[in-house]
Amino acid sequence: MEYFDYESVAKEAGILPDKLEALCKLVRQEFPFDDMMYELHLLRACMAIQQGHTTIDEALRSEEAA
């Protein structure tokens, strides 16, 4: 089941597929059993990148540190 269309936002934000995959893996570690929270956090991260609040590289670093 898909809750949020984070992939479209990621595409609009210019996030490369390999970077999105890396972000997905990191977020999945935080929410291994909760698909809705997993997708919500991905959507929020992609929106922050799209709006210029952060970059994909910064998002990957901050997720790794969490």
Language-model segments: which ranges?
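Long, compositionally biased
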Residues: D35-A66
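N-terminal acidic leader/helix
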Residues: M1-F31
